[in-house]
């Protein structure tokens, strides 16, 4: 059914200064290159990003290049999902990198726990230059490799809101897609939509997603709290509205995480 073991979706937009580091980290992955495809999806870049993608694709068979009109990261990821041919799907932003054994470790873990979970996560390590920043508080809960019950009071505050994840490829027309109507929290909603059936999450302690925290990111701009309210209240109403009576503790913890 699947041509590859792992599909990596890389949305690309005006990232020529960082893109080579991202792609080189994928070339260093220890997973067999016959089991790997990387979808480089250019979202209407105005710089030399598309040219870099094409150069790598000419040299290395794992890379596949697509060029779209600018539609935003959610639409770009959805295009990637719909064109993925791997059993598992993971995501990497074009200015970020993965440690060398990430994809193989995550795929092996998923193989062992396939029926228990729909999503595997691993550490996201924010950095800029030589400086590494504090890890998210969820890693005080996620200490060991394993499967965690998100309805357990001890683990409901794990709050997976970022794209250091791997999910199953359910096949054409069956995969969860990103909500293109959201200006914020599209990652958070996507993760919850994938997790909501089993409410369990897999965690691999050794792989790392190295997140480049560049100056001027969206989350650092003034007025962010205002835009969260204006752009995401409908999202919360829809998500809470799925349940009559008991709302999963994990969903409640996501909301608390936002308002804090």
Kindly label every feature range from the protein language model.
Residues 182-183, 203-235, 250:
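Nucleotide-sugar-dependent glycosyltransferase catalytic core
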């Amino acid at each position: 059914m699947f041509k590859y073991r792992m599909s990596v979706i890389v949305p690309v937009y005006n990232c020529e200064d960082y893109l080579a580091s991202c792609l080189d980290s994928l070339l260093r992955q220890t997973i067999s290159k016959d089991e790997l495809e990387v979808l480089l999806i250019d979202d209407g870049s105005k710089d030399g990003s598309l040219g870099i993608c094409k150069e790598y694709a000419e040299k290395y068979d794992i890379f596949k290049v697509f060029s779209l009109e600018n539609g935003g990261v959610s639409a770009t990821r959805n295009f990637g999902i719909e064109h993925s041919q791997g059993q598992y799907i993971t995501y990497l932003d074009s200015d970020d990198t993965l440690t060398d054994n990430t994809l193989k470790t995550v795929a092996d873990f998923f193989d062992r726990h396939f029926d228990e979970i729909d999503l595997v996560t691993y550490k996201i390590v924010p950095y800029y230059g030589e400086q590494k920043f504090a890890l998210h508080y969820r890693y005080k809960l996620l200490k060991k490799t394993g499967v965690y019950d998100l309805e357990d009071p001890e683990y409901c505050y794990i709050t997976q809101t970022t794209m250091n994840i791997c999910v199953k490829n359910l096949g054409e027309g069956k995969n969860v897609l990103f909500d293109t109507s959201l200006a914020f929290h599209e990652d958070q909603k996507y993760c919850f939509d994938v997790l909501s059936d089993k409410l369990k999450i897999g965690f691999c302690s050794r792989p790392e997603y190295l997140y480049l925290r560049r100056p001027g990111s969206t989350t650092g701009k003034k007025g962010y709290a205002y835009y969260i309210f204006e752009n995401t209240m409908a999202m919360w109403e829809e998500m809470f509205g799925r349940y009559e009576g008991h709302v999963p503790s994990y969903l409640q913890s996501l909301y608390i995480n936002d308002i804090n």
